[in-house]
Amino acid sequence: MAQQEVVEGFKFEQRHGKERVRVARVWKTRQGQHFVVEWRVGITLFSDCVNSYLRDDNSDIVATDTMKNTVYAKAKECSDILSAEDFAILLAKHFVSFYKKVTGAIVNIVEKPWERVIVDGQPHEHGFKLGSEKHTTEAIVQKSGSLQLTSGIEGLSVLKTTQSGFVNFIRDKYTALPDTRERILATEVTALWRYSYESQYSLPQKPLYFTEKYQEVKKVLADTFFGPPNGGVYSPSVQNTLYLMAKATLNRFPDIAYVSLKMPNLHFLPVNISNKDGPIVKFEDDVYLPTDEPHGSIQASLSRLWSKL
């Protein structure tokens, strides 16, 4: 999106923005039920403000403090609850339409996972607790109206105590890892998926569509990792499980064009302890040493053949 210019004999690209703008928004229904979101917002603007770099002329700059204030102003204007994706698009669209010099905007949001609490079997009308994984999104909007929308998950921690192994890998003089067909498989999934919508006018009009889609994608990823409740599904490697999770996402959601997954292999090492008198702890698939330093790092992406990504 950034345009390269020749300035005083040099190639030059620039952008500016505001990061880590924290905003919370509460909506209240007539029935007394409250809804809350907490977002960390980042903004990047692409604009014709070269003079601010070359000389003392700031007349074309949108101040980053103005960007911060705009986040709160637009949150105030949102009278109905909306998804992080819709708010990101709303903000980006504002910057490219309101400011003549701004040619494009990137807005990214990380949503803090506040979840409604259950008290005595009933959803509390205004009580929330902090969950674990985070909902992320990034909207890229250009003055022409073109759009790229990406959503994601950070920190989806999953573990299964069996139905995992790793065998027949390359062996050489540096290899010490034994083959195993029985191990704990644990990871913290970072997922990104990009929607196929290419303009603001092609977006679904259903309220909270992207919030629902986030929950549905998360369920597909987890269900594919674990398999059926009785018996599960065998994982011959993190690589294979990652691929199946990405493929299941594309197969389930036709409006998703691209999926990227990062899945570190968080190790649970068998514990065997002995002394001269014999075993103190004999490992029988029961006692482990959990460690994530160092850990394996596995990542891959999958996209449809017609995708431009």
UniProtKB/Swiss-Prot annotation:
<feature type="binding site">
    <location>
        <position position="238"/>
    </location>
    <ligand>
        <name>urate</name>
    </ligand>
</feature>
<comment type="function">
    <text>Catalyzes the oxidation of uric acid to 5-hydroxyisourate, which is further processed to form (S)-allantoin.</text>
</comment>
<dbReference type="InterPro" id="IPR002042">
    <property type="entry name" value="Uricase"/>
</dbReference>
<dbReference type="GO" id="GO:0019628">
    <property type="term" value="P:urate catabolic process"/>
</dbReference>
<protein>
    <recommendedName>
        <fullName>Uricase-2 isozyme 2</fullName>
        <ecNumber>1.7.3.3</ecNumber>
    </recommendedName>
</protein>
<dbReference type="GO" id="GO:0005777">
    <property type="term" value="C:peroxisome"/>
</dbReference>
<feature type="binding site">
    <location>
        <position position="65"/>
    </location>
    <ligand>
        <name>urate</name>
    </ligand>
</feature>
<feature type="binding site">
    <location>
        <position position="239"/>
    </location>
    <ligand>
        <name>urate</name>
    </ligand>
</feature>
<dbReference type="Pfam" id="PF01014">
    <property type="entry name" value="Uricase"/>
</dbReference>
<feature type="active site" description="Charge relay system">
    <location>
        <position position="64"/>
    </location>
</feature>
<dbReference type="GO" id="GO:0006145">
    <property type="term" value="P:purine nucleobase catabolic process"/>
</dbReference>
<keyword id="KW-0659">Purine metabolism</keyword>
<keyword id="KW-0576">Peroxisome</keyword>
<feature type="active site" description="Charge relay system">
    <location>
        <position position="18"/>
    </location>
</feature>
<dbReference type="GO" id="GO:0004846">
    <property type="term" value="F:urate oxidase activity"/>
</dbReference>
<comment type="similarity">
    <text>Belongs to the uricase family.</text>
</comment>
<comment type="pathway">
    <text>Purine metabolism; urate degradation; (S)-allantoin from urate: step 1/3.</text>
</comment>
<feature type="binding site">
    <location>
        <position position="265"/>
    </location>
    <ligand>
        <name>urate</name>
    </ligand>
</feature>
<feature type="binding site">
    <location>
        <position position="183"/>
    </location>
    <ligand>
        <name>urate</name>
    </ligand>
</feature>
<dbReference type="InterPro" id="IPR019842">
    <property type="entry name" value="Uricase_CS"/>
</dbReference>
<keyword id="KW-0560">Oxidoreductase</keyword>
<feature type="binding site">
    <location>
        <position position="64"/>
    </location>
    <ligand>
        <name>urate</name>
    </ligand>
</feature>
<feature type="active site" description="Charge relay system">
    <location>
        <position position="267"/>
    </location>
</feature>
<comment type="subunit">
    <text>Homotetramer.</text>
</comment>
<feature type="binding site">
    <location>
        <position position="166"/>
    </location>
    <ligand>
        <name>urate</name>
    </ligand>
</feature>
